[in-house]
Swiss-Prot record:
Domain Gla: from-to ranges: 1-43
InterPro entries assigned: GLA-like_dom_SF, GLA_domain, Osteocalcin, Osteocalcin/MGP
Gene Ontology cellular component list: extracellular region
Protein name: Osteocalcin
Keywords linked to the UniProt accession: Biomineralization, Calcium, Disulfide bond, Gamma-carboxyglutamic acid, Hormone, Metal-binding, Secreted
Residues binding Ca(2+) 3: E20, D26
Length: 47
């Protein structure tokens, strides 16, 4: 599984930019973290 520590700051920012367009994903990111939220809404991270 991908963890935040496995990604560069630029990759994390890319995930945030996608996730913040979806209110539900953005809210989940605030509580569960950006990686968990992105995977829940968009599937595996493709970097």
């Amino acid at each position: 599984a991908t963890r935040a520590g496995d990604l560069t700051p630029l990759q994390l920012e890319s995930l945030r930019e996608v996730c913040e367009l979806n209110v539900s994903c953005d809210e989940m990111a605030d509580t569960a973290g950006i990686v968990a939220a992105y995977i829940a809404y968009y599937g595996p991270i493709q970097f």
